[in-house]
Amino acid sequence: PRSDTTPVNRRYAHTALALCTLAFTATMVARLAISPLVPEITATFEVSNATVGLALSGMWLAYALSQFPSGILGDRYGERTVILVAVGSTAIASVFIAVSPSILGFAAFTVLLGAGAGLHYSVATTFLTRQFDDIGRAIGVHVAGGPIAGLAAPPIAALIGARYGWRVGILLGTIVAVPVFALFARNIRPTAPMRPDQSMRERVAFGPLSALLSRPSILYTTALATLGAFTWQATASFLPTFLELGHGLSSTLSALLFSLYFVVHGGTQPVTGSLSDRIGRDETVVLTMTAGVVGYGSLVAVARGGLGLVPTAGAVLLVGVAMSWGAP
């Protein structure tokens, strides 16, 4: 039975939604806590921003690639188990990153963090569909875990890093993930696997996927989404560093502007979604991408001209609007 049958089931469904949202927040906190600490990380390992950027690219790539097998693993082992693995591996990987002895270890453990965190979202969405009839609203609440993490994690990590060093700042991911893991394990009932005996090889079929991507409309949308995701991940990885090194802002102020980016990013998604219903998806995407062109261009121009905090904040606002492209 679903959540609208009895008060007990409704209570459990809302508990599940709250804990899934917290789990998503935990996986995001661990990844976003790294961004404001990049200057200190590069100084410790005596490497360039490009080297650390390569490690973070590996993290986001691993996050993307683990989305697909996560659904298969959920069908085989149950959603609860996979979500616990995602949150638990997030906590462990954050510890490994914090104690990394070299840039190679840092890179390897950030990839591990991305792979583990990526197991959560698809499986949690499937789990929530079993709890709610109005699944759209539930997914909307669940997705809110991302902006929540973006609002809180960067400034907190920056403050911790400024006082105790970047390694302690990285542990913010563990500090958040451990209690979420315990709460989820205690309050969520075991979920029965849907296909416990079917191997992953039987589930993976590349033929239909290839045929789907060969359609021009699908290929165009996929390419656009890929470019947008690339831009989002680049922003999530390096906006605080650019604000600190390019604009001369403090690490704390850079992290606060990074949080502002996430507030705008999350707050404008419902607006762009509604706008796409009124004027069309393509037109709305063009508007958001135009905001991005102006926003990113302004960030560079303001940095070169030394125009100060207010124009910088305005450019960050435009970048936040641009990254709401996913809603249409």
Model feature map: region roles:
Residues S35, R215-G267:
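Extracytoplasmic gate region of multi-pass secondary transporters
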Residues E46, G78, F96-L104, D133, ...:
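Helix-breaking motifs and short loop linkers at transmembrane-helix boundaries and internal kinks
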Residues L65-L104:
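Conserved MFS/SLC helix-loop-helix module at the cytosolic interface between two early adjacent transmembrane helices
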Residues R76-V87, D277-T290:
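Cytoplasmic membrane-interface "Motif A"-like loop-to-helix N-cap segments
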Residues A107-I148:
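Cytoplasmic helix-loop-helix junction between adjacent transmembrane helices
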Residues H142-A192:
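Helix-loop-helix hairpin linking two adjacent transmembrane segments in secondary transporters
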Residues A185-G207:
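Flexible cytoplasmic inter-helical loops of multi-pass small-molecule transporters
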Residues I279-P328:
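C-terminal transmembrane helical hairpin of 12-TM major facilitator-type secondary transporters
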